[in-house]
Design a protein with these regions (language model features):
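Active-site pocket-shaping loop/turn-to-helix segments
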Residues: 2-6, 153-162
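Short, surface-exposed loop/turn segments at secondary-structure boundaries that line and modulate
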Residues: 26-44
Length: 220
């Protein structure tokens, strides 16, 4: 696996962001993460990539203040992948030190607090909130392959403090009912998220100012 550290951190962020829209009352540090590595151990370099994946997951979770509740390792003959699932612990943790910022009575459900599609309100705003300060990268994506940039750097996420700040603010807005609808930018990127939010409708989206707002000139 190329960029195992990048991929692992992005998968952690994806699992946590999927809980962002859930009905309930909780903070980021209330959540626990379960991990599953499906890994092909035969190709040369794959075990080094596995080590990198495990190391990056532990370091990133530590930076986020989120505990790893359990993990599963499965040998695979088809490829290597890692998946994460975020939820509240069913019983109080006996092995983990409590965070002073945890909610007193957190709860969560499978239902969403807000829908994932746009609402028909002309007074509302559509806001894109990046949860990291990393530059935009397209390496390994279908879009990059279509444009012949197969060797570019893969997307990354690496600033846990910035992620925490964004998460707590947006989560509070979701719980207070201020956010009318929300969608996670994950697999497929911004275009896929926009398509999901459109539902059966359409959207004219101008994103040419995203890179300039980041002062990012490297398009590889």
């Amino acid at each position: 696996m190329l960029y195992a550290d990048h991929f692992t951190r992005l998968q952690i962020a994806k699992a946590l962001l999927l809980r962002l829209w859930s009905q309930g009352h909780f903070r980021l540090c209330d959540l626990r993460v379960w991990a599953q590595w499906d890994w092909n151990t035969r190709p040369i370099g794959n075990m080094a990539a596995f080590y990198t994946s495990v190391q990056s997951s532990s370091e990133y979770l530590y930076g986020l203040g989120v505990s790893l509740a359990d993990y599963l390792f499965i040998e695979s003959d088809e490829g290597s992948n890692v998946k994460f699932f975020a939820w509240l612990p069913e019983v109080p943790d006996a092995l983990f030190k409590s965070s002073p910022y945890e909610s007193s009575h957190p709860w969560i459900t499978d239902s969403r607090k807000c829908p994932g599609t746009l609402q028909n309100d002309s007074n509302s705003w559509l806001i894109y909130i990046p949860f990291d300060t990393c530059a935009y990268r397209l390496g390994g994506s279908l879009l990059a392959q279509a444009y012949g940039h197969n060797g570019g750097t893969a997307p990354n996420i690496s600033d846990p403090d910035y992620f925490i700040d964004c998460y707590e603010v947006v989560r509070e807005l979701v719980e207070d009912g201020i956010v009318m609808s929300g969608c996670t930018v994950a697999d497929g990127g911004l275009a896929t998220a926009a398509a999901i939010m459109c539902g059966d409708g359409g959207m004219e989206l101008d994103i040419k100012g995203i890179m300039s707002s980041y002062q990012d000139c490297d398009k590889t």
